[in-house]
A protein has these predicted regions:
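Alpha-helical repeat scaffolds
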Residues: 44-45, 76-84, 235-245, 273-279
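N-terminal leader/linker segments that initiate helical-solenoid repeat arrays
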Residues: 18-66, 70, 74-78, 96-97
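Conserved small/polar residues in nucleotide/adenosyl-binding loops
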Residues: 281-288
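Conserved alpha-helical positions within TPR/SEL1-like repeat arrays
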Residues: 62, 69, 100-111, 136-151, ...
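Amphipathic alpha-helical segments of tetratricopeptide repeats
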Residues: 46-50, 84-90, 124-128, 163-168, ...
């Protein structure tokens, strides 16, 4: 009888160990995919359960939160990421996961409309990141802090953090994020009424986007340059640039109509500008 009980216990331990190894292996696989193939990472995580040790459950919760964010699924319930924090807050040596947990918790709070709560978490991460060499994650953090200040119309603080984001992305050699941060800097500068500086920054973003063939970011740069030339009214827009802006504007989207309003104003075609302005306000067309 005793032998049977012992054998049963050994079998349970064996199969539990196999399950745990399988769970860890799948979590490793999801983590490896999460940057470049977040949809695949999310599929793996959806097939797993939040089981195992406290460390495995916390890792699962953090990875799942990250995968949702990277797949543009806008979660507003923080119960999952709180579960990760309940574990990682007691493990200061795992600073990287501590920072990531607070970062994604901040994003959930921001989506739920709790901007002060999000900012408190972001500033806590900023303090912790001083002890690490993680320029990419620092860049993501500074971009989010900049967004909070931008939404509060504190454009000088927003510009400061967008610039920090750009510098960190540059250090991380991530040119796509560097281009986005440069566009954010330009937007903050534009809203601070420094048109000359905004023009330089939008032009710099366009150069980066052209160099690395980031078509959507190039289009965003062109659209904003058109608006900037219209608003400033000081400089004559180069003909080649104006032609390129016009060619980049789709004629079936709201952003495209907005760009074509600016293009026709710059060409002094008032009737055409009015035509696209009417389309802009009456069309059900989607955004770009």
């Amino acid at each position: 009888m005793k032998c049977r009980i012992i054998l049963e216990l050994l079998a349970i331990l064996f199969f539990t160990g196999c399950y745990n190894r399988e769970q860890i292996s799948r979590l490793d696989e999801a983590e490896a995919l999460i940057q470049n193939k977040p949809d695949s990472a999310l599929t793996i995580l959806q097939q797993l359960k939040s089981e195992g040790s406290q460390a495995e459950q916390a890792r699962y919760a953090l990875l799942y939160s990250e995968a949702l964010d990277k797949n543009h699924i806008k979660a507003t319930n923080d119960s999952l990421i709180r579960r990760a924090w309940e574990y990682y807050k007691h493990h200061p040596k795992d600073l990287r996961r501590q920072c990531k947990t607070l970062y994604y918790w901040g994003k959930v709070k921001l989506r739920a409309g709790d901007k002060p709560g999000a900012l408190r978490l972001y500033l806590k991460v900023e303090e912790k990141l001083k002890d690490t060499n993680e320029p990419y994650y620092a860049g993501l953090l500074y971009s989010q802090i900049g967004e909070v200040y931008y939404d509060q119309m504190n454009y000088s603080r927003a510009y400061h953090y967008f610039r920090e984001a750009r510098n960190n992305f540059r250090q991380a050699d991530n040119t796509r994020e560097e281009t986005k941060a440069t566009l954010d800097m330009a937007a903050a500068t534009f809203n601070s009424k420094d048109m000359e500086k905004a023009m330089r920054l939008y032009s710099a973003a366009l150069d980066l986007a052209d160099e690395h063939k980031y078509d959507k970011l190039a289009k965003a740069s062109l659209t904003n340059l058109a608006s900037l030339y219209v608003v400033s009214g000081k400089k004559q827009i180069p003909h080649d640039l104006l032609q390129r802006i016009e060619l980049s504007a789709r004629q079936d989207t709201l952003y495209g109509y907005h760009t074509l309003v600016d293009v026709n104003l710059l060409k002094n075609r008032i009737d055409s500008a009015r035509y696209y302005l009417c389309l802009l306000y009456t069309s059900p067309s989607p955004r770009d």
